[in-house]
From Swiss-Prot:
Its EC number is 2.1.2.1. It comes from Streptococcus suis (strain 05ZYH33). It catalyses: (6R)-5,10-methylene-5,6,7,8-tetrahydrofolate + glycine + H2O = (6S)-5,6,7,8-tetrahydrofolate + L-serine. Pfam families: SHMT (PF00464). This is Serine hydroxymethyltransferase.
Amino acid sequence: MIFDKVNYKEFDKEVWEAIQAEEKRQQNNIELIASENVVSKAVMAAQGSILTNKYAEGYPGRRYYGGTECVDVVESLAIERAKEIFGAKFANVQPHSGSQANCAAYMALIEPGDTVMGMDLAAGGHLTHGASVSFSGQTYNFVAYNVDEETGLLDYDAILKQAKEVQPKLIVAGASAYARTIDFAKFREIADAVGAKLMVDMAHIAGLVAAGLHPNPVPHAHITTTTTHKTLRGPRGGLILTNDEELIKKINSAIFPGIQGGPLEHVIAAKAVSFKEVLDPAFKDYAQKVIENSKAMAEVFLANPNFKVITGGTDNHLFLVDVTKVVENGKVAQHLLDEVNITLNKNSIPYEKLSPFKTSGIRIGSAAITARGFGVEEARKVAQLTIKALENAENEKALEEVRQEVRALTDQFPLYEGL
């Protein structure tokens, strides 16, 4: 067979070397990007399997191509496991991403031009919750709700008042940078009060929901969407859940043939494997440690007057920090920390005064370091090293000390043994 005997390390040296460099980067860097995680070898193996060869438009038992009996088994397993994890009656595991899951949910719930309320991007929302640069803001009439300017917390009374004024057809709950527990039951009350549907995007907290450590939105939302990576620790992809039989029909049609063609069955296999991992009791222990590590890091920042932790702490895997007392902006902080092998992202904070390309804040997440085995002691050390770097931006000696301590930590907790 053509190319079947080719050693790709030699055939495509450029790609091989880039992959090796990325493996080295991940091994030697402390990963604090809240949307990233470290998948298991089993998940990687499933995603790299022979299923990548198979085209399978449609759904299990209802395909447009033949030879789908094996991928039907895999996709059915993924569906059943997702339903079991979140207590949902129906699931679609085909979305290629969380954004596509959200797109399909909108298509199932509303019409172009309808009014929708979504969380303000700077307050912690997501691009697909109505940002003008996103399909969501360009297709629907999104009106943003915000957080309290003093506390940074969701103000449900203010959201209800705004909903009564706006009269949306849909309310979107969920966030990409909100550190506190979200009351989905309260959001449903607000939606019901104005005759709106409720959609929840739980992409960031899905792993915590799965472990029973954050309220489950599925009983309250008409549709719940999520990614399958982040705190779920699976492959990159999307998932849609609902308890409504009529809505799952609309969701399925919106995904295929609406916005996607053939599903990525190798990725769905990886989703199935990761869902089985989530169902294992060990996953709850992992998720609990994710929260403990996040709180431990936040406490270190809270104790330092040079930094402001938005909302005054965290209930989940992430928190935001205003860094403008020590560096010019979040972009500068991100680049500075890159130099000492600590990876995170600049992030807008509520009522942001700087552009989204600079920002006043950084976002810090604990999911990836926890997957590597970091505990509370190491998490505190990571926060201390982050602060040391930010407070010594012009001190090369101090920055080199941080690099060395980062390397000591990453050597102590290998990314993958024998990869």
